[in-house]
């Protein structure tokens, strides 16, 4: 016989968990639908954006995902992780602006859900919602997330590292 918790506390915990999942799914869906369809409409314009996409393209051509190349010559200025993610995107969606920028759109979704969950944990559900909305509507992060540069992924990893540090500390 399986015993399940009953009463107001169990109902609150269940409702609270499902509202967090529902909120996270809603944030992810709105972020995706408001962002992803227009990623490939503009050509790559920034020097870094062009180089990252070219490095990813050359990873696909050479099969070398460890050593970044631009013009088939070694390019050690940037780490290979982001270009490897772009190459994976290009393998699925083809070589182009959309595939080069899609990883940052996915990073945007993860960042917004992470900000919501952290705000919810630190303060409450409403604070998490407002925090994600404020960040999601901010100009500079949106410009970065619409590009094919390494900064959004780098920022997400730093943010996750700081959160993990404080989680393990307490």
Predicted regions and their residues:
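Membrane-integral, polyisoprenol-dependent glycosyltransferases
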Residues: 2-170
């Amino acid at each position: 016989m399986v015993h399940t918790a009953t009463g107001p506390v169990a109902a609150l915990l269940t409702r609270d968990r499902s509202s967090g999942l529902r909120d996270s799914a809603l944030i992810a869906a709105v972020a995706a639908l408001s962002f992803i369809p227009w990623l490939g409409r503009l050509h790559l314009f920034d020097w870094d954006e062009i180089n990252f996409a070219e490095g990813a393209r050359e990873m696909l051509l050479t099969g070398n995902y460890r050593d970044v190349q631009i013009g088939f010559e070694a390019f050690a200025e940037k780490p290979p992780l982001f270009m490897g993610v772009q190459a994976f995107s290009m393998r699925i969606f083809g070589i182009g602006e959309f595939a080069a920028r899609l990883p940052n759109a996915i990073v945007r979704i993860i960042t917004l859900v992470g900000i919501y969950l952290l705000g919810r944990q630190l303060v409450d559900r409403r604070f998490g919602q407002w925090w994600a909305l404020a960040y999601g509507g901010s100009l500079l992060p949106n410009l970065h997330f619409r590009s094919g540069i390494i900064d959004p992924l780098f920022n997400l990893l730093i943010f996750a590292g700081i959160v993990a540090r404080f989680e393990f500390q307490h």
